[in-house]
Amino acid sequence: DAKIDAALFTSYHCINYYSDFLFCYFGRRYGFVVTPDAATSISAGIDGGQPARRTFGGNVTYTDWQKDNYFHAVRTLTGGVKRLGIEFDHINIDTLNLLKSEFPGMEFVDIAAPSMRLRMIKSAEEIAHITQMTRIADIGGAACVEATKVGTPEHEVALHSTATMVREIAKTWPHGELLDTWTWFQSGLNTDGAHNPVTSRKIEKGDILSLNCFPMVAGYY
């Protein structure tokens, strides 16, 4: 509908969803360029060959020897493109200005909302994957209950839950990546905020407890 020639995804969620590459930012730019003929991730040299080995599509790795190497990579993948889709809700002003400077004849079109709508439509394979994730989350919850006792610190409960989920993920997907699985566990006053961090507070009798288990595989939880 947007009549774009290609798309440059830059966000964690879109790059991970469309390429299965969960990058680690550390001040470097990443991307996933999709054209009618190819899908290619753009990664920094610090990642070595991991993006090429583990992710969907092709891969271009750029070095830090020159500051504009990222944009050179984008240029090599978007030759002849007049209308490029980008994520307006993710690209900051600095990057947008650099894109406009590097590609003066290119028109940039917002594809943030359309790409989100595409991610909302789940395939049968995705549904099967999510079903496995809920099973593993239940295992993490049971481990949390197992570890919860008066006098036990929050972090010990969370660690037991997380370790149990990681082991089950490794068993379920022997060749998968084990990254970012975690547990939110709060007790007592610490339950007053949904996103309060885990602390070393010890559980007391009569405490309200809050639990969220996040088994993370391929960007799903």
Question: Which stretches of residues belong to each language-model region?
Answer:
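Short catalytic-site patches enriched in acidic/histidine residues
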Residues: 15-26, 112-117, 121, 154-221
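A composition/biophysics-driven feature that prefers long, compositionally simple stretches
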Residues: 1-140, 198
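Secondary-structure edge/capping motif, primarily at the C-terminal ends of alpha-helices
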Residues: 144-148
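Glycine-centered loop/turn motif at secondary-structure junctions
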Residues: 3, 103, 151, 169-170
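Short, structural beta-strand-to-alpha-helix junction motif
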Residues: 91-93, 149, 153-157
